[in-house]
Amino acid sequence: MRGAPYRFIAAMLCATVLAGCASPLATLGSVAKVALEVSGITKPELPELQKPPRKVPVSIATGKNLNAGDSGRPLSAVMRIYKLKDTTAFYQAPFDAFVTAGRDKTALGDDLIESREITLIPDQQLNLSETLPRTVNAMGIVVLFHSPGGQRWRVAFDAAEAEKTGVVIGAHACALTVTQGAVLDMQGHGQSEPPRNYNRLAQVNCRT
């Protein structure tokens, strides 16, 4: 009986070849995979939502001028990490929606799965490991600067890509920089490398 699984696999492969499929190589691969799973030699792949949560390494470096704005006086700053189904509401919400307690949950609505808050201090290096359930498609980061520069107080990352590459960001006088991580836009589109302007501060003006 020990050879039964292998005879079963061979029979399935032969049947596929005799059937004369249009894409024999792709079909053979699929049939072989199914045959191995049915025979018990390999385990079938779990559905996405049944897989273990993602583990995303997040590295945050704060500047000596953290939250200084135009005043030049560094201050601590609140950072929030949002675990999201979608990025649309996250990017549409105004800055004030994140400042006022409870308004962020209202603004994000059903897109928000969970969030947490961290206090940043100047000239600090933080290395975190974020656990993202499989229902999370994006990880949003907001820093509540006193004088936020443009839209650079928030950024969202693709959860699946972030698990592979990790996320590396910097927090400065009034803006964030990104040196690693797939940044998502409002439509949920992203790329494996952050946009070039996200690693620059030259064109950022602190709001007064």
Language-model regions, residue ranges each:
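Non-catalytic, glycine-rich low-complexity segments
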Residues: V38-S59
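A short, structured loop/turn motif at beta-sheet edges
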Residues: Q50-P52, T131-V136, E161-K164
